Amino acid sequence: VRATLERFAGAYRAAGAPPVVSATKGFDETTLERMTEILAELWRAEHPAALSGPSIAPETARGVPTAVTIACADEARARRFQELFTGDAFRAYTSDDVRGVELGGALKNVIALAAGICDGLGFGNNAKAALITRGLAEMTRLGVALGAHPQTFYGLSGPGALMVTCLSPQTRNRPAGERLGRGEGVAHLLGCS
């Protein structure tokens, strides 16, 4: 991710450094930085925003009703993004907790892998529901320890994103976890064997 963003940094600045919103739900694999941290560093983006929530791309593209949170330290910019993104089937809510929205979007992927493993092992819905519920509690604890607001983890970028990622076969992480639970090796899963 960092290498790609570095390639476009000059073009971003040449375009006048417009407001930017990240929909990436993860961390840099080397530095563990959140995407807005990387955008601020490499692009010198001022108040980069983050978008997260229960938003599976194929459903959103089909116009299925979708709601997300857009977080930005600049409240006026968050509202402007909200206006730009909100339409008939897509609703954006705002937050000032960029860190929490990004952490919710990233941490839910770990829980989704575990939920898939539950499915692959045949543990049933009771175990999966307990895992998802306890996973949300752990996401919240870690997020708060890293400086996020606890209430962020009870919104669209918390249980909203967590539920869709843990329950939908259209996401990557839950099906990957299911394959792991059935005994497929990580190397095979990643296409390395």
Task: Describe each region flagged by the PLM.
Residues 18-20, 97, 185-187:
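Glycine/charged-rich beta-loop-alpha catalytic/anionic-binding loops adjacent to active sites
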Residues 23, 123-126, 187-190:
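Short coil/turn segments at secondary-structure junctions
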Residues 1-65, 81-83:
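Rossmann-like NAD(P)(H) cofactor-binding subdomain of soluble oxidoreductases
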Residues 33, 136-137, 174:
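A generic alpha-helix surface/boundary motif
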